[in-house]
Amino acid sequence: MDFFSFFTSYLSSFNTFALWLIMLFFCFSSVLVFLKLFGHVGLYVFSALAVIIGNIQVLKTVDFFYSPEPVALGTVLFASTFLCTDILSEHFGKEKAKKNIIIGFSSFLFMTIIMLITIGFKPSANDWVQESLANVFTPMSRFFIASMIAYLISQYFDVWIYSVIKRFTKNRFLWLRNNLSTILSSLLDNTVFSLLAWIILNPDPETLYNVIMIYILGTYVLRILIAFIDTPFMYFSRLFLPKNND
């Protein structure tokens, strides 16, 4: 058996929530490694990767013990971009944090355009991946628009509210500004995306009740948990700053 096939088969034997926690700690630890090795540029790179991979991963749904409905993956990767933004705001300033948002947005836009062109090529007679690529990389336009608008609004809000709390508390209570900014920004992200994708841009709109209960609150429980878990990583980030901290 191929190693990767064996590895994924082995992982599928894990409890879903346990595997989710493993992915969470791997992503957050990777943020610190990128910070240590490459400084703020490393966080730009990580955020770009997280936005791209998260928008692919979100296509897969899994069952969690707390939800009667399937829950889309991607939450961890999207949440890790908020950790990057908060670290940038804390140690490098909000202008670098704002630049990180644009880099993440531009990276996903570039990837989408390139993959649409790739799918547009007429496949050879022996090609066997065209249909699979089309299923993954041909997004419904309403999901693409909703995702990008929600990303920009929630990320810019995160930078703004983080700086407001930091100024109001006079640089004290790192845990407070980290948790509060992430919790509020995540709620805004879920709300904007869900309203756009399932009601405003949907030709067959869902009921507001279903959107709130399934799509907005469905993953928000996990995002609140993530906000608390990423707090130690915010404190550890001080130890992972490169020597030339610019």
Predicted regions mapped to residue ranges:
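Transmembrane alpha-helix/helix-exit interface in multi-pass inner-membrane proteins
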Residues: 107-125, 151, 155
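Helix-boundary and loop/linker segments of multi-pass membrane transporters
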Residues: 132-138, 167-172, 204-209
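Membrane-interface alpha-helices at helix entry/exit sites of multi-pass transporters
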Residues: 95-103, 172-180
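Membrane-interface interhelical connector segments
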Residues: 117-142
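Alpha-helical transmembrane segments and their cytosolic interface
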Residues: 8-19, 32, 170-177, 183-201, ...
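Hydrophobic alpha-helical membrane-insertion segments
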Residues: 103-113, 180-188
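Hydrophobic alpha-helical transmembrane segments
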Residues: 140-154, 218-230
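Hydrophobic transmembrane alpha-helices
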Residues: 1-88, 92-95, 102-105, 109
